[in-house]
Amino acid sequence: MNTIYDILDTFLKAELEDIRRYFGADVPMHVRKKDLVEKLGGYIVTKPSQWLSKMLERDLRLLSRLVDAGPEVPLTLGYPDYPSVLETVRLIGSDTSDPSCRSVWIPKDLYDVVAPHIDEAIKEGESSGAFEVERAALGYLSIYGVLTIEEFFDLMLDYWESSKKQSLDRFTDMIYESPLLKLCSFDHEGMRYIFSPAIYEPESILSGRTEFDSVRDMKRFSPCQAVEAGTGAPYFVFGLDTSEGKDLVRMLSDLGYSGDDLVREEHEIWMHSQMCGDNDAAEAIFAAVTAKQDDILTFEQYNACMDIVAAYANTLPKWLLSGYSANEAKCLKVILQPDEDQLGAMIRKNPLLGLFVPPAAPDDLCPCGSGLSYRFCHGRIMN
């Protein structure tokens, strides 16, 4: 069984220094790797209260679930947009051999270290306001995608003005010490930026924005909206209190989604709608509906579900549009093909064209390769 020290020893020295900085370990940097492993491992083992206070809320709540399950007991979880820090540094175990889900567990030695302290760490995060500050920060990043450091600090000061749960000095320290600044900042053309952890190539957002000259400013959102958008990491959702959002929740619930599965599908629609010009992303926006197509009785009901998803997606803030929605900017809209598309019209006029797609049982996948059942694809055209 690998110990904490064994795991740390697998990293390069430069990586260990990144871990040291993130965990806030006051250990010497300019030492041999062997000594750095010993000192960093000793810090993790002997000072859990100190380094737990440096963790993101998402990591602490995952740790709490793993502690509740017990040492070496795996939990089956979905794949989020980005891994937890503790998975990245391999302090908790994970098995990603199954493409549909991953198993995560806490090793016995880490369990012994954190179990007596994890509840207090979460309690402190809530009572100090640190979690809410983090949610506001994540919310602004989820809404805008990429911000200059100056824009980010200005927005966070808006949040502080609305809450004032800490002194300005304490609040400023919380921002400067934020794990997000350590994890999600980068330099580009002489400017310092911070980006959503859900984005893998933040530079592509900056370059993509140049294609939308009509968007000349950032849309403003209230601090409450930012906290809403940053709650529930890593599955962020937004706009569920709008008429389009309420329609979406009702429709997905009717299709059988509930609890974590419902939140995950709501989140996926927002994330995939960001890049709706990409064919793969456009299809993925509607995955929650197409996955349940066998439970939908008629094409009219199926089409209504798709319309609800598209209507909701077009109200959401987009990274490329600096927080504006597709409806507001009048671009990057999710648009469904009309029922009477060109191919359908041609087949209705000349049924022989339909022979190019062999008939299939109504609930079988359509032979055309669309991924839809035959009755919702070429079957509806031929009937």
Language-model regions, residue ranges each:
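Acidic/negatively charged segments and metal-coordination signatures
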Residues: 1-41, 45-46, 54-383
